[in-house]
């Protein structure tokens, strides 16, 4: 029989691994994990309400509902905030629900795309995750985390492709968590005036230090998502995606989802 310390470590490691995947999806370009360099236009806004989640062997975690707000504060730059209600449903233990970690960020496009040439759009989107969730209940990391990505995008008629990645600072005191990398790339097509469909593939290095009690928690993950964006009109949009892991799926990503509604203005 495992000791209480071992059991606590296992629960923490599972939560850390799943939270890392969820955080990656939350800070992405909805409904995907991969983001783009394009900010909200100056003095415009985006407001999302959404649910995201990931299931692994022995746990399902996610956010429902969560709220995301982006505002074009300056030309080529937007501010960003996500405030989620988070759930954790581990096998053999009580489910938890409450306030999750708060995300703040600023996206800045420093190279604009040459529509008629080869130059892509390039931007950065640094993020910080504040520990507003209760880590003891599996609802947050329990410490400050930060992400520093670079994103690139190019369009060709009805096709758009973008991707990139960056480095997550993820080491908390007295935890086995460690810094890691995330990379992703996406291809999307505007099928009709109202409907866009896309697919992405992504890779994330291990979020837990090697030498942990259970080696399963130290595994990297590679996965994919298929998604769609439907525009009801210029202000109202439906976003959804689903996917799974291709590498170490039982321990990192058996199934993941995003379902959201977006309102844009003015």
PLM regions with names:
Residues 1-31, 266:
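Cleavable N-terminal export/targeting peptides
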Residues 26-266:
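Transmembrane beta-barrel domains of Gram-negative outer membranes and organellar outer membranes
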